[in-house]
A protein has these predicted regions:
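Conserved glycine-rich acetyl-CoA-binding loop
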Residues: 77-88
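Eukaryote-skewed repeat-based solenoidal scaffolds used as protein-protein interaction platforms
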Residues: 87-98
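A conserved beta-strand-loop-helix scaffold within acyl/acetyltransferase catalytic domains
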Residues: 5-79, 97
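Terminal substrate-recognition subdomain of acyl/acetyltransferases
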Residues: 1-13, 34, 38, 98-218
Length: 218
């Protein structure tokens, strides 16, 4: 059956909707999901056979004049369809960005706790931080801006792009093939103390000409 992806205003979610989101056995409990409803503008769901397989809370806005897609929370059911669901949710994010910011380069940012979830950003350019690169200057400044917007700047370490006690939301995706994660990427994430609440702030760019392709409805 086809994947059905739908976006609504987050404020329109009912208690039943939130309970359903909590039932996919992802990383977030009902309290955290309810807080995301308050913090973010858009709520996107992905269904197969009318069964919820994933959701996103996000906002499209400008930071310092630059168009941004802020993925405040994403969670995907651990099923054989997880890769398809991830592609669908990211495709919807790109589509919304294309509608809001046509002909502009756009920053896409989120928080991560595992390296395999970074597959979500495989269509982005200049993903930061990245193994083997040393982010400086404006690159680090973008990390600070996003940490502040995510509300995790109080204990943010700019050189590592790590926010302590920052798990109010992140991109919750577990790959079917975690063994394929490159050792250098796993090493980059080794600085996180995930049980203590650490997250890594990661962002990338989609150029205007690429966004036209990524944001097209299939």
């Amino acid at each position: 059956m086809p994947l059905v992806v739908h976006t609504n205003d987050a404020v329109s979610l009912t208690d039943a909707d939130l309970d359903e989101m909590g039932s996919i056995e992802g990383a977030f409990d009902i309290g955290t999901i309810s807080k995301a409803k308050e913090d973010w503008v858009l709520a996107t769901t992905a269904r197969i056979d009318d069964k919820l397989h994933g959701f996103t809370f996000s906002t499209l806005e400008r930071i310092g004049g630059t168009p941004c897609v802020l993925l405040g929370m994403m969670s995907i059911r651990r099923s054989s369809k997880r890769d398809q669901v991830l592609r669908g949710l990211m495709g919807e994010a790109y589509h919304r960005a294309l509608m809001a910011f046509p002909d502009e380069d756009v920053v896409v940012g989120s928080r991560f706790v595992t390296p395999d979830a970074l597959i979500a950003f495989d269509k982005l350019d200049e993903v930061t931080p990245s193994p083997g690169t040393n982010a400086v200057g404006e690159e680090r400044e973008w990390g600070r801006r996003l940490a502040k917007r995510f509300g995790v700047d109080r204990k943010y370490e700019a050189t590592l792009f790590v926010a302590r006690e920052g798990q109010t939301g992140f991109l919750d995706f577990a790959s079917n093939t975690p063994e394929k994660v490159k050792p250098a990427l796993a090493e980059m994430f080794s600085v996180l103390n995930v049980p203590a609440g650490d997250v890594m702030v990661v962002y990338g760019w989609t150029m205007a000409e690429d966004l036209v392709k990524h944001g097209q409805r299939s």
